Amino acid sequence: MRDISEIDKNLKVETTIQKDGLKFYDIKEQPFKVYGVFHDGERYRRMPDDVAKSVSDAIHYGVKYTAGGRVRFRTNSSFVAIHYKGEMGKMPHFAFTGSCGFDLYFGNTYVGSFVPPMGNNKGYESLIDLGDSEMKEVTINFPTYSFVEELYIGLDENAHIEAPTPYKVEKPVVFYGSSITQGGCSSRPGSCYEPYITRRFDCDHINLGFSGSARAEDEMAEYIAGLDMSLFVYDYDHNSPSIEHLTATHERMFKIIREKNPDLPIIMMSRPKYYLDSTEEKRLEIIKKTYENAKAAGDKNVYFIDGRDLCKLCGNEGTVDNCHPTDFGFASMAQTLGDFIEENGLL
């Protein structure tokens, strides 16, 4: 097949990477497969614009962060490069490799990170040499706190490119919650807790974590209720502004989703924190009460995880600021949640 960029120069990707045989491909084209986000003509996003706008201004903005986004494919290229266009989110307590970086996996094995530059905030290029030409199952995880307008994958022009092997569990696990759910403050996107679950159970997932903005609005609950999912996990304790708000919304969100999904496994979690003050303990009891009420009403597919149990591995050493997990904290969350899912046969 002839390279279309030879005919339409607007499709040619300009690059500063010096690599013989380098050719870029738009991930919107076959055989690449994008998960967790979709392109709306301007950028990749996590929810439809009209739905997000109906929830809140903060959600309308936050859906442009590409947390949970992935592109997957198979190739025997001896290198993989990216050419990324977008707006890069950078924060003092958050590694750039996490907030605005992409990382690379072969199957379940981390291979390397496409490290963003210090000075530029409008995208970048990066290349990882692999050293062999074996066929590989590739996953590239999107940044957790950045906007992605376009992403091109650079491969050897003579390499084979194939569609990825489908996930064993194709219906996604849907995660809803706070900045922790979104991925703050992992050192790279693949070390958030949700990708651990995807790798462990070979399942798709959708990240609906919204920094400071997860308030369990009815519009959000209705949107989630309409998704075709294999499992729903929710934890917005940190973002609920008061005990009164949490009381008014937590069970209500559960009931909205349960009404449309009578057989869906639903896991509710309290905030992942090792030590709780008296107010935080009251919040935990509100969340647990939703679970207890559902069980008392005969619900046989509802589950509860005490957020302190999410810290079993890391103890009190799992955050950057006594709130947002480090990679160690996320690994601890993933281990507890993954073991719970496995023990209860939820995937």
Go through the PLM ranges and name each one.
Residues 86-88, 179, 211, 238, ...:
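Residue-level signal for short, function-critical loop segments
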Residues 1-172, 342-347:
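N-terminal secretory targeting modules
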